[in-house]
Curated annotation (Swiss-Prot):
The keyword Ligase is assigned to this record: no
Alphabetically ordered keywords of this record: DNA-binding, Metal-binding, Nucleus, Transcription, Transcription regulation, Zinc
GO molecular-function term, one example from the UniProt record: DNA-binding transcription factor activity, RNA polymerase II-specific
Native source species: Pestalotiopsis fici (strain W106-1 / CGMCC3.15140)
GO CC, alphabetical: nucleus
Protein name per its UniProtKB record: Pestheic acid cluster transcriptional regulator 3
Pfam family, one: Fungal_trans_2
Amino acid sequence: MSNPVRSKGGCWTCRLRRKKCDEGKPECTTCQALSITCYGYGPKPEWMDNGDAEKDVANSLKHIVRYTSRRTSSRYRVPPGQKANPKLAPKVHAAASTPSTNTSHSTETTPPSDNGFYDTAESPLSPNGAQHLTIATIPAEDSILLMHFLDKVFPLQYPMYRPDILEGGRGWLLALLLQTKSLYHAALALSSYHRRMLVFERISEQCRATAAVQQEKHLETCLNEVRQAMVILDQRTRQRKSYDGMGTVTSIVQLVFFELFAGQDHAWRTHLNAAIDVYDQNCRDKLEHLDLSEASKTILRNDQRLAVDGALVTQEVTTFRFMGGSIIWLDILSSLAAGSVPRLLSYHQGVLDAASQVKLENIMGCKNWLMCQIGRIAALQGHRRQDGWTSQRHGIKLHSIAADIKSEIESGMAREALESLNIQTSDSCGINNSSTNSVTLTTRMFAFMAIIHLHLVTHDFERLDNLRETIADAIRLLQSQVPCSMIPVIVAPLFIIGCVAAQGDEQSLFRASLASDTSQHRLYRHRKDVLSALEEIWSKRQTSTDYTWNDVLDMGQHKYLLFL
């Protein structure tokens, strides 16, 4: 039987380089061997324009190929006196930078999230099965990107994150980065993207193209590893076996950020749903099959405080709580824009309890009690849209829930006011409460947002006079107390409150805030869509007397906003 006829064109990379291509899937062997991006066999890439962009990519590929061919130094350090580990190193070393030409591309049988840079194997000289650690050298290019991620990118993603000293700072993140191949490459892709945005005007066209290729290579590796990890996770879940899910779910969350920042339409929603699925599975299983120490599982199940529990337990508990809180927060934010019920709503009462060890105020700035109520408002909004709740048929139930939510918010704000007085007293005594004050300001802005959002869900844009005092209070706080550096933390309040702003000075204030340099950071390119949506809402409110909140939710661009 004759072989099927193959295209003579090959992948787009080989066509550009005018090289023979074996058309391997998902990438050809030639590109794999040289560790260059294989642009596949689909539609013609945008950069292939017979112009400068194509020339830049070609020059970049030539540069990488030349560099690859010269690189012969060993990639691994072996402790003195120990033989080199015969086990093939995890593939992370091959894709982390530009590898040597003799790099193996064998299919791995171990889970891709296992042992990123820390590789252990039983030594034949150890009859007791002792484990020996082989630490790989992080290439210079990767170390620059890795530190840029830790120092610059992660703080931009989580500007309110202030880890407690008992949590070991951001040590859990560094450990996870070096242990999880997919997360490592997700971080490097995001870091490469951010650095390229920052220095775009200061580097040559060739350097820009090289950075773009580097970014795509890391992103491609991350996506492949996440797909493999999800398959393994699904298999082990069905087999009721333990699995390493924390590295994978952290990788997926970083993909959400990357796709959002890079303006890749609504691709982020697919990965957010995947992260939610993993978190939900862990909670339903009560962590039984998550690859954590028993001590960590006990602390998490009983919602205990961290004490001096050892580095491993501290790392595992901190990672799970941080990522769990992040996923719940992102789930709520996406529900606000999509008009849907938060998928993790059933966990809010426990995870977001005031006494819970998961503190959203340390992750995104708003206190648990209020985010719990915002989740309820999102659910009420979702029921109206998805389940057809109407004032005529479900009026009593709808307004009863709304009244209870409003009462909870007002009670909470009264408590916050008392705490604010205590903060002012402490400040007068010379006590530094800058982080506490930031949380208080953030929570108050989210509280104003919640009251206004609740009104829009139940009354649309009618009876806005009932909100004048709330709007005025929010504007006073924004003008007098909220520093410019906090604007990125309150994008959601700025949007929701801005929706009901009056023409003139009020709308100008929200326009200026969302268009400010701190808001329109180069990493957050999607924020221009937030401001654009707000401008459209103001225009529609002005020209239509029957404009509703459902009309806002049905706006094409609004569905895919994530208020970060």
